[in-house]
Amino acid sequence: MEPPMDPSGGEQEPGAVRLLDLPWEDVLLPHVLSRVPLRQLLWLQRVSRAFRALVQLHLARLRRFDAAQVGPQIPRAALAWLLRDAEGLQELALAPCHEWLSDEDLVPVLARNPQLRSVALAGCGQLSRRALGALAEGCPRLQRLSLAHCDWVDGLALRGLADRCPALEELDLTACRQLKDEAIVYLAQRRGAGLRNLSLAVNANVGDTAVQELARNCPELQHLDLTGCLRVGSDGIRTLAEYCPALRSLRVRHCHHVAEPSLSRLRKRGVDIDVEPPLHQALVLLQDMVGFAPFVNLQV
């Protein structure tokens, strides 16, 4: 009589304990599959029907999904299979899907996962205002959102987000080039009290009006990125220094209208600023020119 086959297709040794004989709920799911990268799960589910069922049960219980764990490029079918049963996600990162991710791909996932607290959609240029509306409407606990390089994000989309996301703390709007001062002012007035981390980098239409309103409405703001915001000047920075006592870091590189006197008050408070003071810049330049930094006596 031939020995029985195990689920993987091999022969089962008499008295042998197979992996799938271990308790799924108490052992395999919390202590084994939780440590297997998503890419390997795609291979594992092909071994047998039993392994496929185990992997599907694990995926249905995911709390965090980062598409980067699958690879730099993930096919649409693979994403749909990985997320089809997930109903308890708290973190979702889909940047590797940026070339093809559409509203039709994303909206059903959002609808099944109302507990989402962190969503990263950087570079997902095929989405539209509909997806952001579904996120704002269906995920009231949302705290962190990245929309960097999403050109479709406009003032109306941001207003909907500000109206429906009371828990929002971190927002990345880098290179959302349709946004203007009016949209940022509305965001500050509606959600400024809870904002701690905000990036408006590379938004040429954002200026002092937006920065001053953020300063007056965001007392807990800790990190602000204004890199490349060409319309931001010293007036906005002075208002930040006056109204944002919790500020820890400020990015103003390529903000050519921001002068050192407006930054000095923040430097004295220990705020990390990515632009060096003029004296340091001069010493670095001199070092580059002559090969060493001479001793400079600053005493008069």
UniProtKB/Swiss-Prot annotation:
UniProt xrefs under CDD domains: F-box_FBXL15 (cd22126)
GO cellular component, one term: cytoplasm
Repeat region (LRR), residues: 141-162, 167-188, 194-215, 220-241, 246-267
Ranges where the F-box domain occurs: 19-66
Disulfide pairings: none
Pathway named in the protein's UniProt entry: Protein modification; protein ubiquitination
Main localization category: cytoplasm
Residue numbers carrying N-acetylmethionine: M1
Keywords, ordered alphabetically: Acetylation, Cytoplasm, Leucine-rich repeat, Repeat, Ubl conjugation pathway
Compartments where located: Cytoplasm
Gene Ontology BP, a term: dorsal/ventral pattern formation
InterPro entries in UniProt: F-box-like_dom_sf, F-box_dom, F-box_LRR-repeat, Leu-rich_rpt, Leu-rich_rpt_Cys-con_subtyp, LRR_dom_sf, LRR_FXL15/At3g58940/PEG3-like
SMART domains assigned: LRR_CC (SM00367)
Chain positions covered by the region annotation Interaction with SMURF1: 113-269
SUPFAM superfamilies linked: F-box domain, RNI-like
Pfam families in alphabetical order: F-box (PF00646), LRR_6 (PF13516), LRR_At5g56370 (PF24758)
Family: Belongs to the FBXL15 family.
Role played: Substrate recognition component of a SCF (SKP1-CUL1-F-box protein) E3 ubiquitin-protein ligase complex which mediates the ubiquitination and subsequent proteasomal degradation of SMURF1, thereby acting as a positive regulator of the BMP signaling pathway. Required for dorsal/ventral pattern formation and bone mass maintenance. Also mediates ubiquitination of SMURF2 and WWP2.
Oligomer and partners: Part of the SCF (SKP1-CUL1-F-box) E3 ubiquitin-protein ligase complex SCF(FBXL15) composed of CUL1, SKP1, RBX1 and FBXL15.
Protein name: F-box/LRR-repeat protein 15
Gene giving rise to this polypeptide: FBXL15
